[in-house]
Structure formats: structure tokens, C-alpha cells
């Protein structure tokens, strides 16, 4: 019997909603990245995008352990001399908490031809509401140790 090789149209995609309230950022990112890639499915293949859609709500209430809010820096460069911009995670969490969560999740995805396609299935919202109720997302529970 030949080995089963999934094709792009063979997979059925579901929608999951993850509540980020009091969840450690790294553990949230790992769970979301696995859902986006489809590693929880028996038909997983690394060369086919078979993952599901993921909605992350309450990104402003995510837990960042240790003193990373004050000391972990995020860098960007404009491309011009002297164009290095740096901010702490705490400053970014005040302005754009959804971008901090999104950057953590996207950093755990592979950097290959499928990455853009996988990234389009991620939606992150700072508050508790999201506009995807028509897709009937299933709540995804993260198992974590109490903090």
C-alpha cells in the first residue's frame, strides 16, 4: 500500500479561538504555531499547508514572565545610517499588544515558501471581541500550570 501524501485541497480547515488571558506568551505562541501548521492532524506533511485558522483574543492580557517587560528590547532599523529604533516589550505592550503576540507566534513558524500562506491564517485582537463569529470558531483550551 503506498504512503499517503496529502494535497492542498484535501484538508478541511477549522477555526480555533484562543483566549490569551494570563497565558505565558511563549506557551501561547507554541500552541498557536502548531495549530497554524496543522501538526495536530494525522495528515500533517511539512510541504503542504494543512493547518487551521487561529484567532487570539485578549492579547493585552497575556503574561510575560520575569522582568522582560522592562529589559527585553525589540529592534527595528529604517535602513538609513543611525536609523536603529529600539523599544522594550513593555512599551510595545502599551501601544500594540496584538503585534507583540503576533510577532511571537510568527517567529515560531518556518521561514520557507509556505510561511506567508500560513501567516494569513492568524488573527490577533487586543480585546475580547472578534469579527469572525460567522466562522463558528471552536474554543481551544491551553493546559498550563497555575501562576
From Swiss-Prot:
Name a Pfam family for this protein. Answer: Ribosomal_L13
Superkingdom to which the source organism belongs: Bacteria
Tell me the GO molecular function terms.
Answer: mRNA binding; structural constituent of ribosome
**What is one Gene Ontology biological process annotated in the Swiss-Prot or TrEMBL record?**
negative regulation of translation
Region listing for Disordered, in residue ranges: 128-147
Which CDD domains would you find in this protein's record?
Ribosomal_L13 (cd00392)
Q: Which UniProt keywords apply?
A: Ribonucleoprotein, Ribosomal protein
An example of a Gene Ontology cellular component annotation for this protein is: cytosolic large ribosomal subunit
Purpose of the protein? This protein is one of the early assembly proteins of the 50S ribosomal subunit, although it is not seen to bind rRNA by itself. It is important during the early stages of 50S assembly.
Q: Which PANTHER family match?
A: LARGE RIBOSOMAL SUBUNIT PROTEIN UL13M, RIBOSOMAL PROTEIN L13
* Assembly information from the UniProt record: Part of the 50S ribosomal subunit.
Give the protein family: Belongs to the universal ribosomal protein uL13 family.
Name listed for the protein in its UniProt record: Large ribosomal subunit protein uL13
Name of the coding gene: rplM
Amino acid at each position: 500500500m503506498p504512503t499517503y501524501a496529502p494535497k492542498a485541497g484535501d484538508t478541511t480547515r477549522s477555526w480555533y479561538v484562543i483566549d490569551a488571558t494570563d497565558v505565558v506568551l511563549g506557551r501561547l505562541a507554541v500552541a498557536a504555531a502548531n495549530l497554524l501548521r496543522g501538526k495536530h492532524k494525522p495528515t500533517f506533511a511539512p510541504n503542504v499547508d494543512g493547518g487551521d485558522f487561529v484567532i487570539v483574543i485578549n492579547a493585552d492580557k497575556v503574561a510575560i514572565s520575569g522582568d522582560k517587560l522592562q529589559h527585553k528590547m525589540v529592534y527595528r532599523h529604517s535602513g538609513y545610517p543611525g536609523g536603529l529604533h529600539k523599544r522594550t516589550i513593555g512599551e510595545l505592550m502599551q501601544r500594540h499588544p496584538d503585534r507583540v503576540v503576533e510577532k511571537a507566534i510568527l517567529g515560531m513558524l518556518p521561514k520557507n515558501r509556505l510561511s506567508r500562506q500560513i501567516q494569513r491564517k492568524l488573527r490577533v485582537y487586543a480585546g475580547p471581541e472578534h469579527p469572525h463569529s460567522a466562522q463558528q470558531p471552536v474554543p481551544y483550551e491551553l493546559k498550563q500550570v497555575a501562576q
